[in-house]
Amino acid sequence: MPPKTKEKGTKAGAQKKKRNAGADVEAESMRRLALLEKEVLQDCLALQRDEARRAKASEDQLKQRIKDLEAELEGARSEGKAIYAEMSRQCRSLQEAMQSRSRQLEEEVEGLREQLELCQREAEAAQREAKQALGERDQTLAQFRAHVADMEAKYEEILHDSLDRLLAKLRDEASVGRGCAETPHQAQGAAPPVWTQPPGSLKL
């Protein structure tokens, strides 16, 4: 394994070079910053001089404009009185028109409010009628279902009675026929068909 002394010396030299390079970079940065500040100050001074010249020119123009406006104002004072009188007349006319329109709108609002109240009362009455009609419909449907169920029960009872009578008649006929001629099926002891469905189980 090589000795570590040489590696330590190499690292120390590299770190020294880095420090020197960092110092050079910092010095260059400071120099550039100073130049930049100088340029900025020069630009600011030039800008201030330009603004001062423009402000002076604007001040002169403003003074001249004020003089012109004063002259125009003096010449328009007489016209201003007439204009003021005309505007006052128009303002009064406009106020009267606004008051008339306001009264008209108030009347329209009152009429619409009355119509709304009437519509609400009619809607409430219609809702009550609809609710009552639904109740009557439900009651009628319940009565109809009860009637249908009663009719079904009666029809089942009638049908079962008819079937019972028919079976009894068939048994009687079978008993009579057994005395005359015995079929092979009956000879083996087979019982005649019997209705086994209980009453009430038949669905129409």
UniProtKB/Swiss-Prot annotation:
Subcellular location per the Swiss-Prot or TrEMBL entry: Cytoplasm, Cytoskeleton, Flagellum axoneme
Disulphide linkage map: none
Region (Disordered), start-end ranges: 1-26, 175-204
Cellular component per GO, a single term: cytoplasm
Keywords, comma-separated and alphabetical: Cell projection, Cilium, Coiled coil, Cytoplasm, Cytoskeleton, Flagellum
Comp. bias intervals (Basic and acidic residues): 1-10
Coiled coil regions in record: 45-159
InterPro entries named among the record's database cross-references: DRC12-like
Main location: cytoplasm
Function of the protein: Component of the nexin-dynein regulatory complex (N-DRC), a key regulator of ciliary/flagellar motility which maintains the alignment and integrity of the distal axoneme and regulates microtubule sliding in motile axonemes.
Homology family: Belongs to the DRC12 family.
Subunit organization: Component of the nexin-dynein regulatory complex (N-DRC).
Protein name: Dynein regulatory complex protein 12
Lineage: Eukaryota, Metazoa, Chordata, Craniata, Vertebrata
Gene name for this UniProt entry: DRC12
